[in-house]
Amino acid sequence: KEGTCQYDTYVMLAGSSFEPDTENPTYTVWGIYGGNAGGTLTGSTNVTLSGGNVRNIYGGNQEGVLTGDTHVAISGGTVQYVLGGGRSGQVNGNTSIWVTGGSVANGICGGLAEGTLGGNTSIHIENAQVESLYGGNEYS
């Protein structure tokens, strides 16, 4: 259900007890979103990963409008895709992604998968493996 929320969010995943199988991956979590499933969120989002095997990390909403900044920090674990914004919709703020360990198997986008980013993107990578890197959106 769509709604309007005003708050900051914090999501953290510290790991799992199994080894990922690259041929038939089993994910600790399929998708992590820093924001809402839909609707409007006014506030900043924070997603932290220090271990585990995650399919997708989105700093913002799955859909809808986020007014605030998004922050994604990865210090360990394995992620397939990282997007600083959301899956779709609009982010009225800045996105930042810090990867200081672990690996990103398929890519990082500073913006959204598709939608509108009304701010700046910042990506910092240190001591990590990343397949590909895009400063803006994945599609449009």
What name fits each language-model region?
Residues 1-56, 62-81, 87-107, 113-132, ...:
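Surface-exposed loop/turn motifs in large extracellular/passenger domains
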